[in-house]
Amino acid sequence: MEKDNKQMIRAWTFYDWANSVFPLVITSAIFPNFYDFVTTHDANGNFTGKSIQLLGIAFENQNIYSFVYAFALFIVVMLTPILSGIADYLGNKKMFLQFFCYLGSISCMGLYFFNRDHLMLSFIPFITATIGFWGSLVYYNSYLPQIASPENQDKVSARGFALGYFGSSLLLIICLIGIMVFKYDPITHQGFFKVKYSFLLVGIWWIGFAQYTFNYLPKKSHDHKITNKDGLFSKGFKELSNVYEQIKLMPQLKRFLTSYFFYNMGVQAIMVVAVLFARNEIDWGNDPVVAEKTKTSALIVSILIIQFVGIAGSFLFSWMSRQIGNVKTLIVTILIWIFICVFTYGVVHTPIEFYIVAFLVGLVMGGVQALSRSTYSKYLPETEDHTSFFSFYDVIEKLGMILGTISFGMISQLTGGMRNSILSLIVFFIIGLIVMFPLTRKKKLEF
């Protein structure tokens, strides 16, 4: 496959434009607000409390959200090794990228039917949409070392995240215009735009713009002749085992992945629970009606701050990596994350203070994601087996996300508040920082 082909790179980065609407609109901005309101209010808008009975146990509504998200990620961890091994064996990872894209986008549309009275059933589209999003990224990320030379991978990765931030922000603004200007009132039955229409738009946007990517990405990266179809399903786990054995012989890569496992716990937990934290831990005033309107609009504004600052942040840290190197730049981002957690735990109680945190999160969010992806890509050996290597990366990422999200939810459930859970995130970032620091040395590492 030709590297640094402009048309190919443009098509690859455009998938970020297509699928980034899911983490923004569904997991960060509109759906968490929608879920929190629906599960704490009746049909007439009266507050009914945050406690929900599920399987005979009383849970805080935000903790159920965390646990369900972790369950969806667990399915991804179990499923993608099988499919990625098959994709590498067949040399047709584009087909799997399309499958997960369609699964995720159609599931987003299914969230239109979310209903508190059938909570378990309503969570199924959320689970399958999460599987679709993260599953597609395994195959999407594995194209990076094939389409871009090592010296261009930071720039290409950052361009993808920047496109994703811009595109998803554009759709969020469209949804906000619909919600604020044409909002449908379920009591008076007036208006045009139901909040749930946003979920339909996410699915249409994702599946529609992804067609540009699918049109230009090659169908096959290499050819294999299948001689033993019976071993295809176990091949994925064997491939992961082989990748692990190779990584054990590469101390730098092993140390980077260990560090990534821990600091990514904190990053992903923040992405998942940020809106719910702000809704429950920030002082929005004493009038419940005014507070509800204020918090919803303010949180959406904070998400937009994160998005647009994130565009600049991804390019800022890409530039910094060219000046001081990827590892030192990642260390800078981790230090900023630690400051964010300490500041949030001890200081953030008002909307203004939360806006400051939103700015800082936006600054480092895109940078840490883009640099993590490109740094891992640079550490990889020359091989055709990129999908299995990125599947291993994905498994490490998801295991960290599962543990981070569950630990956040468990501490919140046991202590009765989400603020105490921030302490666990600080620990994750510090461990990641300590493990990564030896990578700044130029001499060969032993780990």
What are these model-derived regions, one by one?
Residues 58-61, 179-204, 410-429:
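A membrane-interface helix-boundary motif in multi-pass transporters
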Residues 107, 118-136, 352-367:
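Hydrophobic core of transmembrane alpha-helices in multi-pass small-molecule transporters
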Residues 26-61, 272-297:
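Short amphipathic helix-loop junctions that connect adjacent transmembrane helices
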Residues 2-9, 218-258:
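Juxtamembrane intracellular "pre-TM" segments in multi-pass secondary transporters
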Residues 157-179, 394-405:
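Glycine-rich segments within core transmembrane alpha-helices of 12-TM secondary carriers
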Residues 78-92, 312-326, 412:
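Helix-to-loop junctions at the C-terminal end of transmembrane segments
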Residues 98-117, 335-349:
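C-terminal ends and interior cores of transmembrane alpha-helices
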Residues 9, 113, 205-216, 368, ...:
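Multi-pass alpha-helical transporter architecture, strongest
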